[in-house]
Regions:
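Surface-exposed, charge/polar-rich loops and edge strands
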Residues: 1-355
Length: 355
C-alpha cells in the first residue's frame, strides 16, 4: 500500500466555497457494501436509519480563533491563529497562554506586543509573544483582555473570527454556517464538517423515527488538514487530538449493539473518538484523552457500523479512514462517480453515507 493509492485529480471548480442552503439540501451519495451507489439529497438520510439505531455526533464548536490586529509600536498588520492552550500555563479569565501560528512570523519574536480591536476601533485584547516552539515555529502568546472586555473569552468573541480551511477562499457569509446546529464546547480549530448538513428539524424527525442520538467531543486541530507526504503511509506521524466519550454514550452504544442495531458515526471525528475509546477492546468513557489513532486499510473497526462523511482531500488520513471502512477501490470509484455527477468536495461540500 502506497500513499499514491489515495491520490486523485480534483480541479478547483469542485471545491465548495460556500455551504448548501438549507443545510440538508446538499447531495448525498449512499455507498452500499457491494459498491453500489445511490444519488440522493441529504435530508433523505433518514431513509437509511432504522428504529433502534444510534447516531453519534461530535458536539465540538469552532473557536473564533483567527485574530487580526496590529503590532504595537509599528502598527504593522498581524494575524494570529490560536492552535491550543499551552500545557501548564496560566488559564484564568484575565490571562490565557496559547500556542499560535502568526504572520508575519519573522517580525514577531519574544517580547513583541500585539493589539486587537473591535468593530468600533477599541483595543479589546493584547497579545505578547513569550516564546517560539522549535519543532514547528509556532509562537507562545499570552493574551490579556483590555477595555470593556472582562475576560479573554469575551475579548476573543468581540475581535476573533471563525477560521476557515485554507481551500475556502471566497466565503463571506455567516460564520454560523461553519458550525453544526448541535455544537456546544468551543475548543476546535476546524468544524466536524459531516455534521454541517443536519438541521434541527431533520434531527427531530430522526428522533421521532426511533433513532437515538448520542454525543462525543473531539477537539479538531489543524492537523486534520495535513496530507500524507511520505511514500509509505505507515511512516506518517499522526497528529494528536483530545476527545471525550461520555458514559451515557458508552451505555447507549452497548445497548444498541446488544439489541442488534447499528452505531452510525457522523464524521471521521466521531469515528476516531469511538474507535479510540475502544482501543483496548471494550468501549470506555474518556474525558479529554489524547489520541493518535491512525486508521488505514487493514484496521478492524470495533464500534462503528456506518459512517456519514464528506468527500476528503487527496492523500489525506481521512480518505484512508473511510477506505479502511469500505475498501480503497469502492471509495475511489465513488469519488470518480461523484466528479461525474458534479458533487461538491471538502468542508462545505456534499455528503456520503457508507453503509
Amino acid at each position: 500500500m502506497r500513499t499514491a493509492d489515495f491520490d486523485y485529480d480534483l480541479p478547483e471548480s469542485y471545491i465548495a466555497q460556500a455551504p448548501a442552503y438549507p443545510r440538508d439540501s446538499c447531495k448525498l451519495m449512499v455507498v452500499h457494501k457491494d459498491g453500489a451507489l445511490e444519488h440522493r439529497i441529504f435530508r433523505d438520510v433518514i431513509d437509511y436509519l432504522n428504529p433502534g439505531d444510534l447516531l453519534v455526533v461530535n458536539e465540538t464548536r469552532v473557536l473564533p480563533a483567527r485574530l487580526l490586529g496590529n503590532k504595537v509600536g509599528t502598527g504593522g498588520a498581524v494575524e494570529c491563529l490560536l492552535l491550543n492552550k499551552s500545557e501548564g500555563a496560566t488559564d484564568t479569565a484575565a490571562e490565557q497562554t496559547w500556542e499560535c501560528l502568526v504572520k508575519p512570523g519573522k517580525r514577531l519574536k519574544p517580547g513583541a506586543l500585539m493589539e486587537f480591536k473591535d468593530a468600533d476601533g477599541r483595543v479589546i485584547l493584547h497579545g505578547e509573544v513569550t516564546d517560539i516552539l522549535p519543532e514547528n515555529g509556532a509562537r507562545v502568546v499570552r493574551l490579556t483582555p483590555q477595555g470593556n472586555a472582562v475576560s479573554v473569552d469575551l475579548a476573543m468573541h468581540l475581535v476573533g473570527r471563525t477560521p476557515l480551511p485554507p481551500y475556502i477562499t471566497e466565503y463571506k457569509g455567516d460564520d454560523e454556517m461553519y458550525q453544526t446546529v448541535y455544537s456546544k464546547t468551543e475548543r476546535s480549530a476546524a468544524a466536524p464538517t459531516a455534521g454541517l448538513h443536519f438541521t434541527k428539524e431533520l434531527l427531530e424527525r430522526i428522533k421521532e423515527k426511533g433513532v437515538r442520538v448520542a454525543t462525543v467531543d473531539l477537539e479538531v486541530g489543524l492537523g486534520t488538514f495535513r496530507t500524507v507526504n511520505e511514500d509509505d503511509p505507515a511512516e506518517h506521524d499522526m497528529h494528536v487530538e483530545l476527545y471525550t466519550v461520555p458514559q451515557a454514550t458508552v451505555d447507549a452504544v452497548r445497548e444498541t449493539k446488544a439489541a442488534g442495531h447499528r452505531v452510525i458515526a457522523v464524521g471521521t471525528t466521531s469515528v476516531r473518538s469511538l474507535e479510540s475509546a475502544a482501543a483496548d477492546g471494550e468501549l470506555e468513557a474518556k474525558n479529554r484523552a489524547a489520541t493518535k489513532l491512525y486508521i488505514m486499510p487493514g484496521y478492524e473497526y470495533k464500534v462503528v457500523d456506518s459512517i456519514i462523511t464528506n468527500f476528503h482531500v487527496p492523500r489525506s488520513t481521512l480518505l484512508m479512514l473511510v477506505s479502511a471502512f469500505s475498501s480503497r477501490d469502492i471509495v475511489m470509484n465513488a469519488y470518480e462517480e461523484a466528479k461525474r455527477n458534479d458533487y461538491r468536495f471538502f468542508s462545505f461540500g456534499d455528503s456520503m453515507m457508507l453503509l
